[in-house]
Amino acid sequence: MKRQVALDTETTGKSDDGTPGDHRIIEIGCVEIIDRKITGRHLQVYLDPERPIDEEATKVHGYTWDMLKGKPKFADIAHDFIDFIRGSELLIHNAKFDTSFMDKEFSLMGLTEKTTDIATVTDTVSLARKLHPGHLVNLDNLCNIFGVSNKHRVQHGALLDAELLAEVYLAMTGG
């Protein structure tokens, strides 16, 4: 049995150098795939980032700090999240971005584990560039190339983007 998890995060923003800096995760979305079949099992959590959300980030995903105050903190859900992804192959579009945020959150909790200690990671941006050179490889364009409907995607959302990524990955790698 091969277990994969399409994963996406939404964040409060990013530093000028593209690293998390003092930014935090505000949403995690995961979609389980077993033996190339989307199982219907998923994980979605909204998180209180304990800090304001950059205006540019809000334009991308639509979330404000007021909407997320009172939601669980990352530490509150971390063990359930780790249990969900442990031992799987994570499919992440631009994996360096998401894993850097997850690793930062683990570190803030005092955990020494990195994402790659918990699961293997496949960067679907790199995979798309390898399999389909010359194409734009953002998620919307890949949806168009592979006939995955994304008409309901007005803004980014971690679970929605993970669902789209799961479908794109399966189409991109042979259906």
Label every PLM stretch briefly.
Residues 160:
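Acidic donor-binding loop at a coil-to-helix junction in glycosyltransferase catalytic cores
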Residues 1-119, 129, 137-155:
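Conserved non-catalytic scaffold segment of RNase H-like nuclease domains
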Residues 170-175:
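Acidic two-metal-ion nuclease catalytic site recognized across multiple nuclease folds
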